Amino acid sequence: MSNMPNIKIGVVAVSRDCFPESLSVNRRKALIDAYKAKYGEEHIYECPVCIVESEIHMVQALEDVKAAGCDALVVYLGNFGPEIAETLLAKHFDGPKMFIAAAEESGDSLMDGRGDAYCGMLNASYNLKLRNVKAYIPEYPIGTAEECADMIHEFEPIARAIVALNSLKIISFGPRPLNFLACNAPIKQLYNLGVEIEENSELDLFEAFNKHE
């Protein structure tokens, strides 16, 4: 028996309107191809909506990943990225999220192929903090398609742990009776993790035992 959640990660590309949208879209496709080639397609979903400085696009992407059954979210900056829409997406997505960004492929296409996603990543992290949105950002979040695919794979166990904890309920037995939280053991950090806890006394256990006879 396995009690670990099966994670599906939705990848949403974002683009600033002063950069070609196609740059983010093509980089997203390359990222998804790199991931599937190395890790398979069971845990990944490519959102077809590219957010281009639009809250309408943000809502469309949010509804799409929800409809696809995604448990976790990757916001992928194919270029500088729209700070408002991309962080609003993270705010409204109810689940673990990660931000990563595309490195420049080469110095030969800096007219149409330059994305400045490194700078966009700095601004995105600052805006996440302003909104008090918790998101996972790798130690070095900028990479090629293959490197970003590895980052997503490394994010999977993190996302799985968060989803599992948010669905966890601990039923414990100790000296305190049921529903006396004021005199319960320190449980705030469990609540902060999204864990629910129910503590029962020995008398509660005895009563439950007798009811099952």
Residue ranges, per PLM feature:
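Metallocofactor- and cofactor-centric catalytic cores in central/energy metabolism, strongly enriched
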Residues: 1-162, 167-171, 176-213
